[in-house]
Design a protein with these regions (language model features):
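Conserved tyrosine-mediated DNA breakage-rejoining catalytic core shared by Y-recombinases
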Residues: 17, 43, 52-85
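Basic, Lys/Arg- and aromatic-enriched nucleic-acid-binding interface segment
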Residues: 2, 12-43, 47, 96-98, ...
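Amphipathic, well-packed alpha-helical segments that form the structural scaffold of globular domains
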Residues: 22-23, 118-126
Length: 136
């Protein structure tokens, strides 16, 4: 973790590598992280906005509207058919308690923190040998 007020650098992930990572995570039954990476790549949402999403917002819809946490702006996002299919597949495997439940819930039943997500992403980078310097 970086020091407060320090400058950090994030690196980019090549599109084909991102798509391969999404497929590998799903194949390994890590549907929560597969969904996280897919939503991040396809929508460009910040992690704080992804963590605030609920199943009823993204399941079986062509588009959805959110108010971004950081900027307070209203934003409408369209979901392509490939992502819609992946969301449905993840929903069926994750088996949440209901459609109003948050999409990313820990085993304890709480929403993941950003720090936990960063730790998990670091582990994913190592396990799947993702070619990227700074992953967040």
């Amino acid at each position: 973790m970086s020091q407060k007020y320090s400058t950090t650098t994030a690196d980019f992930l090549v599109w084909s590598d991102a798509m391969n990572l999404i497929r590998k995570l799903a194949k390994d039954n890590n549907y929560k992280m597969s969904l996280l990476v897919a939503l991040g790549c396809f929508t460009g949402l910040r992690i704080s906005d992804i963590l605030a999403l609920r199943w009823n917002q993204i399941l079986g819809v062509d588009e959805f509207t959110i108010i971004e946490k950081k900027t307070g702006k209203k934003r409408t996002l369209r979901l392509n058919p490939q992502l819609q299919k992946h969301i449905q597949e993840c929903y069926e495997h994750i088996k949440p308690i209901g459609v109003k439940a948050p999409i990313l819930v820990s085993q304890k039943g709480t929403i993941f923190t950003i720090q936990t997500i960063n730790r998990i992403l670091k582990d994913i980078k190592k396990k799947y040998k993702v070619k990227i310097k700074n992953f967040s």
